[in-house]
Each structure stands twice: as structure tokens, then as C-alpha cells.
Curated annotation (Swiss-Prot):
NCBIfam families: PRK00558.1-5, uvrC. This is UvrABC system protein C. Residues 203-238 form the UVR domain. The keyword Cytoplasm applies. GO terms for biological process: nucleotide-excision repair; SOS response. Interacts with UvrB in an incision complex. PANTHER family: UVRABC SYSTEM PROTEIN C, UVRC/OXIDOREDUCTASE. The keyword Cytoplasm applies. One of its GO terms (cellular component) is excinuclease repair complex. It comes from Pseudomonas fluorescens (strain ATCC BAA-477 / NRRL B-23932 / Pf-5). It is found in: Cytoplasm. The UvrABC repair system catalyzes the recognition and processing of DNA lesions. UvrC both incises the 5' and 3' sides of the lesion. The N-terminal half is responsible for the 3' incision and the C-terminal half is responsible for the 5' incision. Keywords: Cytoplasm, DNA damage, DNA excision, DNA repair, Excision nuclease, SOS response. Belongs to the UvrC family.
């Protein structure tokens, strides 16, 4: 603890009631948030002279101030603790990295509604199903609905402006309601069947379709009978894949696993006896590395901090924690629903539990192995470059454009544990000659390292540039102009064969040219980072180019600003459909007069 903090004086005035405590460092940064049944007893445990875990000792050494909030009971303390953790994300708490809202399947309103993925507030008029553990789980369900019932999933703006069926109709994934090729009542029946599937009533749906198939066959409507037969076959195949033997209710199976270096929580979501999907979580491990602490922290953040998430009737867990009764009470207070947490289970439920444990163990092992793999490559690179120790931060830059159009520079960052995606950056390049990669790189590096000079960001140990001597020399010029401290510059250029494994490398002033063997771990690291920079630049360039092409044609029209351009494109479903529209059709768009429609039409057909 710091010199200004006196634990004895603090504890002498500390309450013995339930509450929440907050620990701060000398710069008033929040380090840790905790709750306690008895604040004085809990806080006293931090200042014992023996028996402290290393991470707890590291936390205590930084404490300069402790604040407490007394609560009426433990439940209130847990609710306040979770609120503070979610808001401040203290570095010594166990934190869920992925705290995004879970996705739902959304069924829109109207005569021919669409199914889509939805996140966030439920403001749109329609019906919501879920939440699902991941967007991937939703895509699987939507794909099945397309194959089985051929319900539409296109955007409304696209749907409203179709004049002929799209490719989805040709491959039997949609019945083309956009051009009237299906009756409303037939489509409504397909939607009703889709809803039955999403609600977990697959058995009732299969029985209903079987009855309809027999009726169609008895009236010699063999085409309809064959269609129903195919639907039943698809549904039964999915039922076999997704069913949990012996399961009929709503259950989340949660397993936590901790190893030196990390933790993993695996969640399997079962609704109506059907597996909606599963997901791995890798919480940031704080001062507590006990598996029960990880489980308790996960359940608190997952269900208490995010009350919009779907709550099953039961949780099956692989470890128990003394806070579970308080957690159940907090959930009951928030949701008005009772939750059962089961640990000692038998039969099928025990197999579910073991499956979750196995997945958590394997996922964490794979993650740690990948970290070790990347770390070994960093060590190999240090050996190749004759460094005293492996670099901790490597930045790579690349440029992407289409004949000089929509030029974008990318910056990706890697450390010994892998990519640091929160530090990735893209730079939209402006004011340079089209296709001048040197000028584009100069601008990107200048913008990046000017911020560093102003005290923003971190200095990399190695700067990797995708290019040869010219790009490397230009990078050196930028660093000299900005008086950036010495750092290692590494250029990577395609070799004479332009094949992977034959790259030519240039170090610092480009005078040092060398190659590495194709099986060199150091070369593999360079290739990995270069390819990631290339991918990141291309995706940014394509997005920028697409946006430019969608709007640039309308930018010269007086009276059509950014908002009106967006509204026009949304109304017609894109620039191509707008180009096909007549003056009268354009004038029917919201906010467009006949005179403005004439200007827009003339601009679109000026060539």
C-alpha cells in the first residue's frame, strides 16, 4: 500500500454492516470493487501479513484510498457491485470482455414480414425470438427457415423496389413476395410455421406438416405432398442435431475452468429442449483466480448487470460459490422470477454438465497454446534481429486502393499474446496523387506518430512496412521529421518469384537485406502480421469505395445533402434502382419535389 494510506486508521472507523468497497491508487484510479456481508471483516483480510496471493499483494501495494457504501443487505450490495463493475471495469476485477447485447431473431410487421438478426433496444414493431448465444447460431436458424419455408430476409428498401425475382427465388430460398408470386395467406402460413420452429415447438410442427402431407397425397396433390415431405425431412434432421436427450425445459449449462494464464467459461443454451448454441467467454482474471470466484463473477455480470438477457428456469453449473443465494435473490429482485442453480446432477443432465466442462477446458487450452505459439514466434524474431529480448509491440502498415480511388492505410498491432485489435487503426488518405503509395504511407505514418509525439498511444518496438527499400526509406524520413526515438524498422517485399516463403526483408536503413527460410517461425510471424494488415486495409478500402460510389453521383445535385441522399438510397434500395426510376417515381420519394426530381434524373443520366 502507498505511504499515505494507513490501514489501521481506516479499519478502526470501518462499519461491520453489508456494503460495497472501492479501492483507488494514488492517481485516484479505481483498482477494484468488492462487496461484503461485513465490510470490516472483509477489508481486514486484505491487510494480513501472511497468506496473501501474489495478485492480492500487488493490489494492496497500490492502495491509496478506500471508499465504502453501506447497503441494507447482501442482495443490495451485489446489485451495486455489478453496476460499478460494469460502469468502471476496474483492472483487478474479473471482467467479461464480450459484454455486447445478445442477438435476437426479429420478425417484422406487415403482410409479407421478414426475418432478420437484431441487437439492441426492441423499438421496432414486430416479434422477437431469443436471445441466441451468438450471431452464428441465428444465421443457422435463418438459413434453415430459408431452405424449409422460403421466407424472405431482404431489407425492406430492397424488397419494395424489386421489379423481378432475385437470385434467392431462383435457388428456392424465397417465394418472391416482392413481385406477387405468392399469395398473402400462403406466405402467412409459412411465417406461422417458422414461428413454431423458433418457439421450440418442432414436434408439434412436424406432426402438423405430416398431417398436411397425408391430406395432400389423398387428394392427389403430389407436388404439395413432396414439398411438405422435404420440409419434414429438413426439420427432423435439425431436431436430431439440436436435441438434448431427455431435455424439455429452458436451461443454461455453465462450466468454468481456470489454468495458469487464463480462464474460460463455456455456456450451452437450451430452450424447449433444443440447443440454440454455445459460446466461450474468456474473462479477464483479476485478483481472484479460484474457479468458483470466476463462476460467481461471470453469473453476476451475465445475468445481473445485463437484465435484458433471457433468463432460463435453471442453471446447471460445475462449481458452487457461497454467493449463489445472494445472486438468486438479486435476480429475483430484478426479474421477478425464481432461478434454480443446480450442481449435483445425474444422468443426461450430468452429461450436459461434463460436455460444458470439456468444452471450457479445450477452448482455454487452445487459446493458451496459440498464445505460446505466437510468443515463440516473437522469440524467434528477436533471435533473427539479434535483440536482447523479444519485442512486446509490433506495428505493421499497408495501403489499399483501386487505381488510386478511396485510398485507405491500415495499422495492425501484435504482441506476444497475439493481435491487439483494440489498437488497430485505419486512415482515410486525402490530398495525395492517385496511386502514390509512398505519399499515402507518408501521410498515414505522419498522422500516427504525430499523436505519439503529443503523448497519445504507445511506441512500437518494431515498425513493419509492407514494401521494399522505398517504403522503408520513406518511413525513416517520417520518424526523423517527427524526432521519434529510435525504433527498429523492418520492410517486407515479395521476392523474385512473388510467392509466400520467398520474401526479401530490409532492416532499418534498407542497407541490410536478407531472407529467411520458408519454415522460419520468425518469417511466419512477419507473414501473419503483414497478411492481417493487408486484410484490414482491404476491408476498409472496400467499405469506403462502396460508400463513395453510392453517394458521389448525387453529391453534385443542389438541394440534395447527406441526409436526403441517404433517404433516397434507402427509399429505392440503392443507386442502381434509383437510376432506373422515372422522374415521376423519384418525385414520389419523401421530401422530393418534381423540380428536384428532374435535377436528380438529369444528373443520373448526364453521360
Amino acid at each position: 500500500m502507498t505511504e499515505q494510506f494507513d490501514p489501521s486508521a481506516f479499519l478502526s472507523t470501518c462499519s461491520g454492516r453489508p456494503g460495497v468497497y472501492r479501492m483507488f491508487d494514488s492517481d485516484a484510479r479505481l483498482l477494484y470493487v468488492g462487496k461484503a456481508k461485513n465490510l470490516k471483516n472483509r477489508l481486514s483480510s486484505y491487510f494480513r501479513k501472511t497468506g496473501q496471493a501474489p495478485k492480492t499483494a500487488a493490489l494492496v501495494a497500490r492502495i491509496a484510498q478506500i471508499e465504502t457504501t453501506i447497503t441494507a443487505n447482501e442482495t443490495e450490495a451485489l446489485l451495486l457491485e455489478q453496476t460499478l463493475i460494469k460502469e468502471w471495469r476496474p483492472p483487478y476485477n474479473i471482467l467479461l470482455r464480450d459484454d455486447k447485447s445478445y442477438p435476437y431473431v426479429f420478425l417484422s410487421d406487415g403482410d409479407f414480414p421478414r426475418f432478420s438478426i437484431h441487437r439492441g433496444a426492441k423499438k421496432q414493431k414486430g416479434k422477437y425470438f431469443g436471445p441466441y448465444p451468438s450471431a452464428g447460431a441465428i444465421r443457422e436458424s435463418l438459413s434453415l427457415l430459408q431452405k424449409t419455408f422460403m421466407v424472405r430476409q431482404c431489407e425492406d428498401s430492397y424488397y419494395k423496389n424489386r421489379t423481378r425475382p432475385c437470385l434467392q427465388y431462383q435457388i428456392k430460398r424465397c417465394k418472391a413476395p416482392c413481385v406477387g408470386l405468392v399469395e398473402p395467406e400462403v406466405y402467412a402460413e409459412d411465417v406461422r410455421h417458422s414461428v413454431m420452429f423458433l418457439e421450440g415447438r418442432s414436434n408439434a410442427l412436424t406432426d402438423e406438416l405430416s398431417t398436411a402431407m397425408e391430406a395432400a397425397a389423398s387428394t392427389l396433390d403430389f407436388e404439395k405432398a413432396a414439398e411438405l415431405r422435404d420440409q419434414i425431412s429438413l426439420l427432423r434432421r435439425v431436431q436430431d442435431q439440436q436435441s438434448m436427450e431427455g431435455g424439455t425445459g429452458d436451461v443454461d449449462v455453465v462450466a468454468a475452468f481456470v489454468n495458469p494464464g487464463g480462464a474460460c467459461v463455456h455456456l450451452i443454451s437450451v430452450r424447449g429442449g433444443r440447443v440454440l448454441g454455445s459460446k466461450n467467454f474468456f474473462p479477464q482474471v483479476g485478483i481472484e483466480e479460484d474457479v468458483a470466484e470466476v463462476m460467481s463473477a461471470f453469473l453476476g455480470q451475465y445475468f445481473v448487470s445485463s437484465p435484458e438477457r433471457d433468463l432460463p428456469s435453471e442453471l446447471i453449473v460445475n462449481v458452487v460459490h457461497e454467493d449463489f443465494p445472494t445472486l438468486i435473490a438479486a435476480i429475483d429482485e430484478l426479474r421477478g422470477r425464481e432461478l434454480t442453480i443446480s450442481h449435483r446432477v445425474r444422468g443426461t443432465r450430468a452429461r450436459w454438465q461434463q460436455l460444458a466442462v470439456t468444452n471450457a477446458e479445450q477452448a482455454l487450452s487452445a487459446r493458451l497454446a496459440n498464445r505460446q505459439h505466437v510468443a515463440a514466434r516473437f522469440e524467434a524474431l528477436a533471435e533473427v534481429l539479434n535483440l536482447d529480448e523479444p519485442p512486446q509491440r509490433l506495428e505493421c502498415y499497408d495501403i489499399s486502393h483501386s487505381s488510386g480511388e478511396a485510398t485507405v492505410a491500415s495499422c495492425v498491432v501484435f504482441g506476444p499474446e497475439g493481435p491487439l485489435k483494440s489498437d488497430y487503426r485505419r486512415y482515410n488518405i486525402e490530398g495525395v496523387t492517385a496511386g502514390d503509395d509512398y505519399a499515402a504511407m507518408h501521410q498515414a505514418l505522419t498522422r500516427r506518430f504525430s499523436k505519439l509525439k503529443d503523448g497519445e498511444g504507445k511506441l512500437p518496438d518494431i515498425l513493419l512496412v509492407d514494401g521494399g527499400k522505398g517504403q522503408l526509406s520513406m518511413a525513416r524520413d517520417v520518424l526523423n521529421e517527427l524526432a521519434v526515438p529510435d525504433l527498429i524498422l523492418l520492410g517486407v517485399a515479395k521476392g523474385a518469384t512473388r510467392k509466400a516463403g520467398f520474401e526479401t526483408l530490409y532492416l532499418n536503413d534498407a542497407a541490410h537485406e536478407f531472407t529467411l527460410k520458408g519454415d522460419s517461425p520468425a518469417l511466419h510471424l512477419i507473414q501473419q502480421i503483414r497478411d492481417e494488415a493487408h486484410r484490414f486495409a482491404i476491408t476498409g478500402h472496400r467499405a469506403r469505395r462502396g460508400k463513395t460510389r453510392r453517394t458521389s453521383t448525387l453529391e453534385g445535385v443542389a438541394g440534395v445533402g447527406p441526409k436526403r441522399r441517404r433517404d433516397l438510397l434507402k427509399h429505392f434500395g440503392g443507386l442502381q434502382e434509383l437510376s432506373r426510376a422515372s422522374i415521376d417515381e423519384i418525385a414520389k420519394a419523401p421530401g422530393i419535389s418534381k423540380k428536384l426530381a428532374e435535377l436528380i434524373y438529369a444528373n443520373l443520366h448526364s453521360e
